[in-house]
Amino acid sequence: MIDSLPAFWAVIPAAGVGARMAADRPKQYLQLGGRTILEHSLGCFLDHPSLKGLVVSLAVDDPYWPNLASASDPRIQRVDGGTERSGSVLNALLHLHAQGADDEDWVLVHDAARPNLSRDDLDKLLAELANDPVGGLLAVPAKDTLKRVDKHGRVVETVDRSVIWQAYTPQMFRLGALHRALADSLVAVAVITDEASAMEWAGMAPRLIEGRADNLKVTRPEDLEWLRQRWTNRR
C-alpha cells in the first residue's frame, strides 16, 4: 500500500439499453433508493479527492440524462457513446486526450449499472495499482461449482474454480495504453468485452484485485430487487 492515492479520471459508459431488464427505459435510469442507478454509480467517484474529472458516454438521443441533476454538474463531461461498450469508452478517452490529459494518467472505467461500489474497494484498487506497470481491475473469485457445456446444454466437464474469477469494475489502466489497445482491437475486429480483455488482446496481463461481491452489476430484475432490499436493511 502507498501513503497517498493516485489522481485519476473516471469513465462511465452509459449508452446501453439493458434489454434483459425488460423495463420501459435503459436500466441505468431505473430508480434505486430515490435516485437513478446511474446517479449512484457516478456518486461512487464524484466526492473522491483524487478524481480529476469524469466522462460519461451516452446515447446520442438520450432523453433521460437532461432531466438529472448530474447533467449540470461541472465535474461531469458528456460524450456520445458508440454502438458497443468499447466504442463508448474509446470516445471518452479521445475526449480526455483532447482536453489535455496525459498518456500516463490513470483512467478508471466503471459500469453505469454497478451502483454499489464501496469507497474501501475504490481506495484499495487505487492503492494496489498505483505503481503497477499494467493496471488491473476489481474481481471476485468464483464460489459456485462451474460447468462447461456443449451446444446442447450437456455438461462436458467441471471447471477448476480455483483459477476462475469474475471480472468487476472499476478497471484501471493508463490512458495511452488503454486507448491504443481499444483502437487497435477495434480495427482488428477482435471480441472485446471489457477494458481488461482489450489489454489482454494487446499482450498485457492485468492484475486482479479482490473486491466485495456486493459490487453487483444490475443485469436482471432480481439484481435490482436484491439491491433494494439490501439498501433498505441498512437503514
From Swiss-Prot:
It catalyses: 2-C-methyl-D-erythritol 4-phosphate + CTP + H(+) = 4-CDP-2-C-methyl-D-erythritol + diphosphate. GO terms for molecular function: 2-C-methyl-D-erythritol 4-phosphate cytidylyltransferase activity. Signal peptide: none annotated. CDD domains: CDP-ME_synthetase. It comes from the Bacteria. The keyword Nucleotidyltransferase applies. Pathway: Isoprenoid biosynthesis; isopentenyl diphosphate biosynthesis via DXP pathway; isopentenyl diphosphate from 1-deoxy-D-xylulose 5-phosphate: step 2/6. Its EC number is 2.7.7.60. It is an enzyme of class 2 (transferase). Belongs to the IspD/TarI cytidylyltransferase family. IspD subfamily. Catalyzes the formation of 4-diphosphocytidyl-2-C-methyl-D-erythritol from CTP and 2-C-methyl-D-erythritol 4-phosphate (MEP). HAMAP family: IspD. This is 2-C-methyl-D-erythritol 4-phosphate cytidylyltransferase. It comes from Pseudomonas fluorescens (strain Pf0-1). The lineage of its organism: Bacteria, Pseudomonadati, Pseudomonadota, Gammaproteobacteria, Pseudomonadales. The gene is ispD.
